[in-house]
Curated annotation (Swiss-Prot):
GO CC list: extracellular region
Family recorded in the similarity comment: Belongs to the peptidase A1 family.
Name of the protein in question: Pregnancy-associated glycoprotein 72
Compartments it resides in: Secreted, Extracellular space
Membrane-spanning ranges: none
Length: 25
């Protein structure tokens, strides 16, 4: 997780969804 993602709202949402998807299984 780089600081670059923080500056990109869309990328941040995608990253959050990606992490959430892994957590769910």
């Amino acid at each position: 997780r780089g600081s670059n993602l923080t500056s990109l709202p869309l990328q941040n949402v995608i990253d959050l969804f990606y992490v959430g998807n892994i957590t769910i299984g």
